Amino acid sequence: MKQSRPLRENRKHGDLLFPVSAYETKMEEDFQMPLSYHWHPEIEIFFITSGKANFQVEAEQFVIEEGDVLLIKPNTLHGSHDCFGTKLEFRAVVFDFSVLSWMANVRIELKYLQPLLAQEQGRYILLREKNSIQKALFEMLNKTFFVFDEKEKGYELLVRAYLLQV
């Protein structure tokens, strides 16, 4: 994707040494704030903790709801305009691929990480199935969010470890 593509998000996610950010958004009932359509060069893991919303990734629209986990690949246009007038709470972790690949085993990067993010495999991954693996993934994302939010000494190591586990 070319850098000149419109709707690029201007927000900086993390910093040069640790390009990771975590966000939490809570919307009350009947509050229809759109999640502006945008793209960024980072990976985004978006997970719904309460409610549901119409979501769009590139030209594809679908409903995401409590418990769903959406991995949005780099340089992918995404956003929402309809939260059904219901309470909606979600968290997002946005990070550069280098957080996963830095000092990672080359075999792991080539065999698992690069194919996961390959655009020919689709622009996103949506996990809806409510089984034990998905539940553990959701818990791991919440741990990632809380560790990032607290920012205690060494938090970067835990955030990276949790993201690799996801």
What are these regions (language model features)?
Residues V63, V69-K73, G85-R91:
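A short glycine/small-residue-enriched secondary-structure motif
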Residues M1-V69, T76, L110-K111, Q121-I125:
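Generic protein-terminus/edge-of-domain signal
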Residues V57, L100-M103, E152-K153:
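A generic structural signal for short coil/turn motifs at secondary-structure boundaries
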Residues E129-S132, F148-Q165:
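All-alpha amphipathic helical-bundle segments outside canonical DNA-binding/catalytic cores
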Residues P74, E120, F148-E152:
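A general structural signal marking secondary-structure boundaries and capping sites
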Residues K2-S21, L77-F145:
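A hydrophobic/aromatic-rich effector-binding and dimerization subdomain
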Residues S50, F146-D149:
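Residues at helix-coil transition
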